[in-house]
């Protein structure tokens, strides 16, 4: 590991920290761009041929959305303009950055070109600031909240339907991201972002690590964990979001879409989970791994729910 790679990795991490510790829109935007530039520069330095095309596509989309966000953010946060047009465009660009329906078109093409480490950075670290901005936008009207809610639940269902027709692991992770973006969107407006992001982030990181290591037993269990199947901890995260959303006027629609997306998603998660499980050699270690994985998931999930 070279000094350059360490510095660029630090940029990826320090960008979100800078944004979330400032109340100035320009500083928030600069932090957002620091992490993006650090990510792109790092993988150009590493010369990842396979992921080069995906990263450039990601960079173009993020650059366009960031430019539009900067201009609209100046009107909203600096000039305190209350125009619905500026607010609508700003939220639209946030959804493009995150990859939420109907602006999810780039997720699967980009994910299919990225390594598992890249997917973790794009799906978690570079998503922190846009989600944080969405959660702390005090100028959002009730109409905009209802719109975000509807798009979130649609993203949940649409991502689940896309995943049914995919057969490659990276593409399935992309479809899963679209679904979880819907859950993250709902957690932002319900004030439960921290708990859901922690459970989702932990489940995704564990899966990506085991995919990199090629541990089939652990991959199988990690897929079930990412699906939100009880008693895994992501189930606790989803229940917490639904309980918070029960206070809104659209609670029935949220509940119906959430159940539908969860059931549909579970089908393709189970398909891949069973595939990895059946290809694994039968030995006593798998029972030990299963017990330990379940224990950690259930314990962590319950502790988070009780906090």
UniProtKB/Swiss-Prot annotation:
<keyword id="KW-0999">Mitochondrion inner membrane</keyword>
<feature type="transmembrane region" description="Helical">
    <location>
        <begin position="58"/>
        <end position="78"/>
    </location>
</feature>
<feature type="transmembrane region" description="Helical">
    <location>
        <begin position="217"/>
        <end position="237"/>
    </location>
</feature>
<dbReference type="InterPro" id="IPR001750">
    <property type="entry name" value="ND/Mrp_TM"/>
</dbReference>
<keyword id="KW-0812">Transmembrane</keyword>
<protein>
    <recommendedName>
        <fullName>NADH-ubiquinone oxidoreductase chain 2</fullName>
        <ecNumber>7.1.1.2</ecNumber>
    </recommendedName>
</protein>
<feature type="transmembrane region" description="Helical">
    <location>
        <begin position="1"/>
        <end position="21"/>
    </location>
</feature>
<feature type="transmembrane region" description="Helical">
    <location>
        <begin position="144"/>
        <end position="164"/>
    </location>
</feature>
<keyword id="KW-1278">Translocase</keyword>
<feature type="transmembrane region" description="Helical">
    <location>
        <begin position="193"/>
        <end position="213"/>
    </location>
</feature>
<keyword id="KW-1133">Transmembrane helix</keyword>
<keyword id="KW-0813">Transport</keyword>
<feature type="transmembrane region" description="Helical">
    <location>
        <begin position="25"/>
        <end position="45"/>
    </location>
</feature>
<feature type="transmembrane region" description="Helical">
    <location>
        <begin position="88"/>
        <end position="108"/>
    </location>
</feature>
<feature type="transmembrane region" description="Helical">
    <location>
        <begin position="287"/>
        <end position="307"/>
    </location>
</feature>
<dbReference type="GO" id="GO:0006120">
    <property type="term" value="P:mitochondrial electron transport, NADH to ubiquinone"/>
</dbReference>
<dbReference type="Pfam" id="PF00361">
    <property type="entry name" value="Proton_antipo_M"/>
</dbReference>
<keyword id="KW-0830">Ubiquinone</keyword>
<comment type="function">
    <text>Core subunit of the mitochondrial membrane respiratory chain NADH dehydrogenase (Complex I) that is believed to belong to the minimal assembly required for catalysis. Complex I functions in the transfer of electrons from NADH to the respiratory chain. The immediate electron acceptor for the enzyme is believed to be ubiquinone.</text>
</comment>
<dbReference type="GO" id="GO:0008137">
    <property type="term" value="F:NADH dehydrogenase (ubiquinone) activity"/>
</dbReference>
<keyword id="KW-0249">Electron transport</keyword>
<keyword id="KW-0679">Respiratory chain</keyword>
<comment type="similarity">
    <text>Belongs to the complex I subunit 2 family.</text>
</comment>
<dbReference type="InterPro" id="IPR050175">
    <property type="entry name" value="Complex_I_Subunit_2"/>
</dbReference>
<keyword id="KW-0520">NAD</keyword>
<dbReference type="GO" id="GO:0005743">
    <property type="term" value="C:mitochondrial inner membrane"/>
</dbReference>
<keyword id="KW-0496">Mitochondrion</keyword>
<keyword id="KW-0472">Membrane</keyword>
<feature type="transmembrane region" description="Helical">
    <location>
        <begin position="119"/>
        <end position="139"/>
    </location>
</feature>
<feature type="transmembrane region" description="Helical">
    <location>
        <begin position="250"/>
        <end position="270"/>
    </location>
</feature>
